[in-house]
């Protein structure tokens, strides 16, 4: 979902610069800009054997900036789609069938349920850590957390004797710590960027440690005041700080790490129902077993969500009032407004 952050042309050029690498996306119809960049299915033979590995790529593009999606359409697979995945693999007669999934942990579990006999799902998107993976209904599922802290290593042992068969499969999350040496070329690029003295310029002082929630609320208050709006909302993922802002001097580096996207602030005219629907639409359930994650910070009002099969919301907003709402352009662009200006 982040591959389009710099636009379709940048993604196309990036892919064209790696001619020996195959890119696969199965649940999307691509624009002319990305024509011939992706395949819906890839089969790779293992040299010296009769074994081949088939790959399907599935992605959840809900969080992709809609301004970068011109000409691209996609569907989130449902139960029938999952059932048809096995049939697609059978058509190509591969020995090993692998799904590269950016659908999230919950959708991967559904895929395991409705698509038995997939050998491996290499998953992501919801930042779940499975140190040794899950093995269910013959399918091995791998998730390795987030922030490049770990890399997944999946091992499949197979027999080349007829009939060719898989003997075992396993996966593990390997920590990318100081024991693994840095690439010298990449390390130098990072050093030149992060060593810019401008980043160390002090722009303020934090009188105490500031939590992620408080930072999000401060964002909202700032854009509410700057835009002279009635209220403000901000998406949780727009605050990129991992945990908190330390007590003491605040530098440009700190600010950049909090918000590196250069978002523009927009205002919209919205009713109580519109605002509550936006908040509920960002109340995501990453798995069937867990509750939702609050994805929207606010100022100028408060709200409460009652989790359940059908989550509901109450707020201090008033019926019959049209509010001027300030928000980042990302949040604005990724919600279909019943009423907006």
Language model segments and positions:
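Basic, gly/Ser/Thr/Pro-rich low-complexity segments located predominantly at protein N termini
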Residues: 6, 59-62, 109, 128-129, ...
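Acidic, metal/ion-coordinating pockets
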Residues: 1-185, 214-222, 267, 284
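Generic surface-pattern signal
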Residues: 16, 91, 191-199, 228, ...
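Feature captures C-terminal
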Residues: 20-27, 39-41, 217-341
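Intrinsically disordered, low-complexity segments enriched in small/polar residues
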Residues: 52, 69, 193, 202-205, ...
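Generic, ordered loop/turn and secondary-structure boundary motif
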Residues: 3, 73-75, 204, 256-262
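Bulky hydrophobic/aromatic packing residues
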Residues: 2, 72-74, 130, 211, ...
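A short C-terminal boundary segment appended to hydrolase-like catalytic domains
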Residues: 158-249, 256-259
């Amino acid at each position: 979902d982040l591959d389009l952050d710099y636009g379709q042309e940048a993604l196309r050029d990036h892919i064209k610069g790696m001619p020996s690498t195959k890119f696969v996306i199965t649940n999307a119809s691509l624009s002319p800009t990305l024509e011939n960049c992706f395949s819906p299915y890839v089969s790779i033979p293992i040299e010296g054997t009769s074994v081949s590995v088939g790959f399907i790529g599935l992605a959840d593009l809900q969080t992709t900036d809609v301004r970068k999606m011109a000409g691209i359409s996609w569907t989130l697979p449902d139960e029938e789609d999952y059932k048809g995945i096995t049939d697609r693999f059978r058509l190509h007669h591969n020995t090993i069938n692998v799904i590269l999934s950016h659908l999230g942990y919950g959708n991967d579990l559904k895929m395991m349920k409705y698509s038995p006999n997939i050998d491996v799902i290499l998953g992501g998107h919801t930042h779940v850590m499975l140190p040794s993976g899950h093995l269910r209904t013959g399918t091995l599922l791998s998730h390795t957390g987030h922030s490049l802290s770990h890399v997944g290593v999946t091992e499949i042992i197979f027999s080349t004797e007829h009939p060719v068969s898989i003997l075992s499969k396993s996966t593990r999350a390997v920590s990318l710590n100081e024991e693994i040496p840095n690439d010298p070329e990449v390390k130098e690029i990072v050093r030149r960027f992060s060593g810019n003295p401008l980043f160390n310029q002090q722009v303020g002082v934090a009188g105490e440690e500031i939590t992620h929630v408080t930072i999000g609320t401060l964002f909202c208050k700032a854009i509410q005041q700057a835009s002279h709006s009635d209220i403000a909302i901000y998406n949780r993922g727009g605050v990129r700080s991992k945990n908190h802002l330390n007590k003491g001097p605040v530098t440009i580096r700190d600010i950049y790490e909090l918000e590196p996207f250069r978002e523009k602030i927009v205002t919209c005219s919205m009713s109580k129902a519109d605002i509550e629907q936006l908040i509920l639409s960002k109340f995501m359930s990453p798995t069937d077993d867990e509750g939702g994650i609050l994805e929207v910070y606010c100022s100028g009002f408060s709200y409460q969500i009652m989790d359940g099969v059908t989550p509901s919301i109450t707020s201090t907003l008033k019926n019959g009032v049209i509010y001027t709402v300030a928000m980042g352009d990302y949040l604005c662009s990724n919600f279909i407004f019943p009423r907006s200006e």
